Amino acid sequence: MASSSTNSPCAACKFLRRKCQPECVFAPYFPPDQPQKFANVHKVFGASNVTKLLNELHPSQREDAVNSLAYEADMRLRDPVYGCVGVISLLQHQLRQLQIDLSCAKSELSKYQSLGILAATHQSLGINLLAGAADGTATAVRDHYHHHQFFPREQMFGGLDVPAGNNYDGGILAIGQITQFQQPRAAAGDDGRRTVDPS
């Protein structure tokens, strides 16, 4: 930024054809190499109005104010009817359109996420059903095996007089009765098959 110490007037003082004083309010914000910036501001707002505005502001706020005035002046010269309002309206319209597009994209994404969750649920359900069927088959086979392996006491000994209890002597006695029961049948079978000598 230019100052009076450079012996070169600021763009405002040069445009107004006056001597740039050390306390010039325009010097920090309108350097000599940006004459068009002040020309536009002066044409739209007037140098006196800008001077009054800057004097009422705190020095820390003046730079932002000058940049805003310069932008508004440039837009007003480009579009005398709407000025910067036309640009703001266009940007707002673009923002609304982008928000609509974003909402649609989120809706589509939610649909795909729901389909993914549903597919995963169906897959998990199918795996559980297969596992349940396999467990049921294994249980049926196990029950069938136990049914044929372990018979009731009455079915095993066929009504024989077997002493009650699980002692060893009772088991031996039962086996002896079965053996005695089978031997006469075998003998009778042998007699039935014996051939008679015709002589």
UniProtKB/Swiss-Prot annotation:
Assigned keywords, A-Z: Developmental protein, Nucleus, Repressor, Stress response
GO cellular component: nucleoplasm; nucleus
Inducing or repressing factors: Negatively regulated by SHOOT MERISTEMLESS (STM).
Remarks, miscellaneous: Gain-of-function mutants iso1-D and iso-2D (T-DNA tagging) show completely curled up hyponastic rosette leaves.
Organism: Arabidopsis thaliana (Mouse-ear cress)
GO biological process: adaxial/abaxial axis specification; petal development; polarity specification of adaxial/abaxial axis; proximal/distal pattern formation; specification of symmetry
InterPro entries: LOB
LOB domain mapped to chain residues: 8-109
Ion transport listed as a keyword: no
Deleted gene: phenotype: Plants are indistinguishable from that of wild-type at 16 degrees Celsius, however they generate a weak phenotype of pointed leaves at 22 degrees Celsius which become narrower at 26 degrees Celsius. In the leaves of plants grown at 26 degrees Celsius, the xylems are located on the adaxial sides and the phloems are on the abaxial sides, similar to those in the wild-type. Plants with double mutations in this protein and in RH10 or AS1 protein have abaxialized filamentous and trumpet-like leaves with loss of the adaxial domain at high temperatures.
Location in the cell: Nucleus
Tissue: Expressed in young shoots, roots, stems, leaves, flowers and adaxial domains of cotyledonary and leaves primordia.
Name of the molecule in the record: Protein ASYMMETRIC LEAVES 2
Main location group: nucleus
Annotated Pfam families: LOB
Function: Negative regulator of cell proliferation in the adaxial side of leaves. Regulates the formation of a symmetric lamina and the establishment of venation. Positively regulates LATERAL ORGAN BOUNDARIES (LOB) within the shoot apex, and the class III HD-ZIP genes REV, PHB, and PHV. Interacts directly with ASYMMETRIC LEAVES 1 (AS1) to repress the knox homeobox genes KNAT1, KNAT2, and KNAT6 and the abaxial determinants ARF3, KAN2 and YAB5. May act in parallel with the RDR6-SGS3-AGO7 pathway, an endogenous RNA silencing pathway, to regulate the leaf morphogenesis.
Higher taxonomy: Eukaryota, Viridiplantae, Streptophyta, Embryophyta, Tracheophyta
Family: Belongs to the LOB domain-containing protein family.
Subunit structure: Homo- and heterodimer with AS1. Interacts with AS1. Part of the AS1 repressor complex composed of AS1, LBD6/AS2 and HDA6. Interacts with LFR.
